[in-house]
Regions:
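Predominantly soluble domains enriched in secretory-pathway, periplasmic, or organellar proteins
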Residues: 1-328
Length: 328
């Protein structure tokens, strides 16, 4: 019965303008936001109208995105000029730009501490930005290749995957590395944290690991396609969604730590956005040289209910307790 409820189905396959070349996708103010470095644009896709409804142009190499739902603000890493754009999600306008020392790649806003974090893959650093000052206040030299990051509210620490070292670093409020989990696998990238179960899920080469979030001990190992990077948690549905570069999306049963369902899509993409309020998954990617948006949903959710719910964008998308920066 659980397996039937968890099965994914493709709701729509939609053409997007331009050539493929997406960096990150996320939800903001009920819309799907996509960064496109190739065209130096940020595009806003409406799940209801199923088309691009806004576009932010003339920005330099947009990459990672993070959202402060409470203030209606979105932050976008601009790798081309070492800065972070501050965007108002009510009208999709750039309010200001914050300079940083190192080329930013991924961002994470932590509402509990009112802190913005930015990784630099090029310079192997982690920057801390104080938004009250609109300034970078600290740079942590990692001497490793940073990938995904999330905040563990229970332990009040930032967790950061170090891909080339095969480690997960734990960083405290004073911006010091206070611990490292060594995973028995190569190339850890995406993460998701289940606060209730105290399980940390980590994408590694050909698997997703379930770790004890307090000790780092491996609890389970779930086989996955190569290139699986993006992980998105649905605690209400007891599911973990994982996207691989070949376009397949996995639904992992968190009760049994097994893949409940795998759905190959018609596009090649590696970043996903999940709208927990409406149970919809968005995967932008490419197919035969053209840009596409795949919309997926668990088979138990009807199309009518999804569209009725999605037609009320004023309803804020819930923020999970574990804030996560998606894999580029």
């Amino acid at each position: 019965m659980f397996g039937l409820a968890a099965k994914l189905r493709q709701v729509a396959l939609i053409d997007l303008p331009g050539s493929p070349g997406f960096s990150q996708v996320t939800m903001a103010n009920g819309q799907v936001v996509i960064t496109r470095p190739g065209t130096n644009t940020i595009e806003v896709f409406s799940p209801v109208k199923r088309r691009i409804i806004a576009r932010i142009s003339q920005i330099n190499d947009p990459r990672g995105i993070t959202v402060d739902n409470d203030s209606g603000t979105m932050y976008v890493a601009l790798a081309g000029n070492n800065s972070i754009a501050v965007v108002d999600t009510r009208n999709w306008s750039v309010e200001k730009v914050i300079p940083v020392q190192h080329r930013p790649e991924k961002l994470l806003w932590v509402p509990q501490t009112k802190t913005l974090y930015a990784t630099s893959v090029l310079d192997r650093t982690l920057s801390i930005i104080d938004l009250r000052l609109s300034a970078e206040t600290h740079v942590l030299e990692l001497n490793a290749l940073p990938q995904d990051m999330l905040y563990d509210g229970a332990r009040q620490t930032l967790l950061l995957t170090l891909q080339d070292l095969g480690q997960i670093a734990s960083i405290d409020r004073s911006n010091k590395i206070i611990g490292r989990y060594k995973v028995v696998a190569s190339e850890p990238t995406g993460m998701a944290l289940d606060e209730q179960r105290r399980r940390l899920y980590v994408a590694v080469r050909y698997a997703v690991l379930a770790l004890n979030a307090d000790t780092g001990a491996e609890v389970a190992r779930i086989p996955a396609p190569g290139g699986t990077d993006a992980l998105v948690l649905d605690p209400g549905g007891n599911l973990l969604y994982a996207a691989a570069g070949d376009g397949s999306v996995l639904a992992i049963d968190l009760n049994r730590n097994v893949v409940d369902h795998e759905l190959p899509t018609d596009v090649k993409g590696y970043s996903i956005a999940y709208d927990p309020a409406h149970k919809m998954i968005f995967l932008p990617g490419g197919r035969e040289g053209r840009s596409k948006m795949v919309i997926l949903s668990p088979s138990g959710v009807t199309e009518t209910n999804r569209l009725q719910n999605a037609a009320s964008p004023a309803e804020a998308t819930p923020q999970s307790a574990a804030q996560t920066a998606m894999k580029k």
